[in-house]
Design a protein with these regions (language model features):
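Membrane-helix interface and helix-disruption motif detector
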Residues: 1-3
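Short, charged/polar connector segments at secondary-structure boundaries
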Residues: 5-148
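Amphipathic, charge-rich alpha-helical segments that serve as recognition/docking helices
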Residues: 97-100, 158-163
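Short, surface-exposed recognition loops or helix-turn segments adjacent to catalytic cores
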Residues: 123-126, 154-159
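Contiguous mid-protein beta-loop-alpha structural module that forms a pocket-lining wall or clamp
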Residues: 147-150, 155
Length: 163
């Protein structure tokens, strides 16, 4: 193996994944809803290729209990880890859109944010390993795509979330 071949192999093994990982962390520009949606979809596809696994699975919390009250708070987006069992969602575990079915609502939420509309807080359920979305999947997706670090939320209070 020549030095040039060795350097090329090293670049493919180290540099390319490093550059891809940096690109995965970049927030999208919110001025064009279609471009923002496509950038988030592309980020989902790159992440799936890098992991060589199905990155489309959004963790689901199965619960039959519906807490009676909620508490208003600000929640770090990194602590939102999945969805409460309400059917399939067109997002991966980082809330990047994994299907075109998310486009219309994603665009509507992004336009509302760009127009200065105050969106309602997301409704979350606290589990043992983080928060699960009851309502507001598209708001979480747009917030993450734009690089926000936290979001306003109503957290469903459960006296024993890990029981």
């Amino acid at each position: 193996m020549t030095v040039l071949e060795y350097v090329a192999m090293l670049a493919a093994l180290v540099l390319v994944p490093w550059l891809a990982a940096r690109r995965l962390a970049e927030p999208v520009d919110g001025s064009d809803p279609r471009a923002a949606f496509e950038a988030a979809r592309a980020r989902h596809a790159r992440r799936a290729l890098l992991r060589r696994a199905d990155a489309s699975a959004l963790p689901v919390l199965t619960t039959s209990r519906r807490p009676a009250r909620t508490v208003a708070c600000v929640v770090p987006l990194r602590e939102i880890v999945g969805s409460v069992d309400r059917g399939p969602h067109p997002f991966d575990r980082r809330f990047d859109p994994s299907a075109d079915t998310a486009w219309a609502r994603f665009a509507a939420v992004l336009r509302a944010r760009n127009d200065g509309v105050e969106l309602p807080p997301v409704l979350l359920h606290q589990g043992c390993d983080g928060y699960y979305v009851l309502d507001g999947h598209h708001r979480v997706a747009v917030a993450r795509a734009l690089g926000d670090t936290e979001t306003r939320a109503e957290v469903a209070v459960d006296p024993s979330p890990c029981a």
